[in-house]
């Protein structure tokens, strides 16, 4: 692992990391992303987070496999959503439509915005950081972002066209035109 970069007043700021350099970073038992060239390190997801993400992955995965709509990506798959400085985000679940899948599979973190991104909130998530992730996904071209809040038992839906909505636990998550035909009662994954 490269030496940690430190900033001392009066000196030049530390060099920014690239998506390619991030491939070589190994921090056991941590989740990492690259945000505008700066390494972001987080604790592993907790029990509730993993359960909710797993429940939705099973339902969404069954639909994607049955319809052959595209490819589902598991938690912590990195996608390069900006260059210069680089930003590599790793959602809890991502879906890319079949016609947009790169061929052959790219090495590393592809310059590709998933069509659907799912973020499951953890107790330590800060609202500003979550909204920054949503903004990064949408500006990169993601069409639909679901932010699921297990504690409040709601999901916030953000769309590329700028519209937003809230799904209560007694309502249904809908794949809209991004994952056609997919719907899932929110309560069934919480």
Question: Positions of the model-derived regions?
Answer:
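Gly/Pro/Ser/Thr-rich low-complexity, intrinsically disordered segments predominantly at protein N-termini
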Residues: 1-190
């Amino acid at each position: 692992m490269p030496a940690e970069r430190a900033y001392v007043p009066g000196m030049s700021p530390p060099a920014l990391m690239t998506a390619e350099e991030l491939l070589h970073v190994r921090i056991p038992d941590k989740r990492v992303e690259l945000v505008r060239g700066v390494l972001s390190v987080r604790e592993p997801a907790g029990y509730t987070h993993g359960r909710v993400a797993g429940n939705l992955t099973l339902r969404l995965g069954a639909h994607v496999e049955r319809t052959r709509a595209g490819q589902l990506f598991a938690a912590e798959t990195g996608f390069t959503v900006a260059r210069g400085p680089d930003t590599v985000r790793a959602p809890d679940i991502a879906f890319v439509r079949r016609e947009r899948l790169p061929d052959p599979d790219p090495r590393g973190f592809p310059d590709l915005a998933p069509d659907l991104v799912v973020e499951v909130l953890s107790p330590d998530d800060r609202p500003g950081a979550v909204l920054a992730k949503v903004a990064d996904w949408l500006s990169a071209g993601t069409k639909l972002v679901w932010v699921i809040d297990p504690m409040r038992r709601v999901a916030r839906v953000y769309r590329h066209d700028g519209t937003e909505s809230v799904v209560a636990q007694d309502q249904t998550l809908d794949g809209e035109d991004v994952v056609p035909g997919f719907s899932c009662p929110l309560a069934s994954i919480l």
